[in-house]
Amino acid sequence: MESWRREKLSRLIAHFRRGAGERGIELLASSTPIQPIMIGASRLAQATSQALEARGFFVPAIRPPTVPHGKARLRVALSARHEESEVEQLLDALASALAAARVTEH
């Protein structure tokens, strides 16, 4: 990979992680382009994934048996082709979808 792509991807990862923290989105430790978002309940992960897909974002839910019960998560895959504005749109959509899914969960 060309150095400018690596540098851009590193900036996008840092931007995503910082923005997620600012929005209260719980991330698992990862310095790679794969950013796991801890959700917990499988239904909540699936509902959030579907809400994001309806908004044009492909963020798959990773559920048992791939991960232990109660440890469902979302899988964000960043690439150097993404722009910061797209990462911001994703973060806003994530925060909104998570809030909506949590409301319907109760």
Please state what every model-predicted region is:
Residues 1-58:
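Conserved PLP-dependent catalytic core of the aminotransferase class-I/II
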Residues 54-58, 65-106:
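PLP-dependent enzyme catalytic core of the Aspartate aminotransferase-like
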